[in-house]
């Protein structure tokens, strides 16, 4: 059963953040990501929401807990911890 995540957080600069997100694509895919959609908030262009589909919740959790992902988020300019919703298809 597919799992879904919706993560929202501010970034210092969208272009920088998006470039680094794209660099992690193969790592995300190898970690069980099936798809990703990036949204920029209409009222704040440096606030983003990413909607992902995963093989499983466990796959997402394993990837999200990787140290290189967390340091990559800081390098990309994420300025606050993300708000994350995790769920399975009903």
Provide a role label for each language-model segment.
Residues 1-71, 75-90:
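Short S/T/G/P-rich N-terminal loop/turn motif that feeds into the first structured element of a domain
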């Amino acid at each position: 059963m597919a799992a879904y995540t919706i993560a929202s957080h501010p970034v210092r600069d969208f272009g920088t953040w998006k470039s680094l997100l794209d660099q992690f694509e193969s790592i995300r895919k190898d970690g069980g990501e099936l798809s990703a959609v990036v949204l920029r908030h209409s009222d704040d262009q440096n606030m983003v929401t990413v909607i992902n589909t995963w093989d499983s919740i466990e796959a997402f959790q394993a990837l999200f807990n990787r140290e290189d992902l967390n340091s990559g988020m800081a390098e990309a300019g994420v300025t606050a911890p993300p708000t994350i919703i995790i769920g399975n298809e009903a």
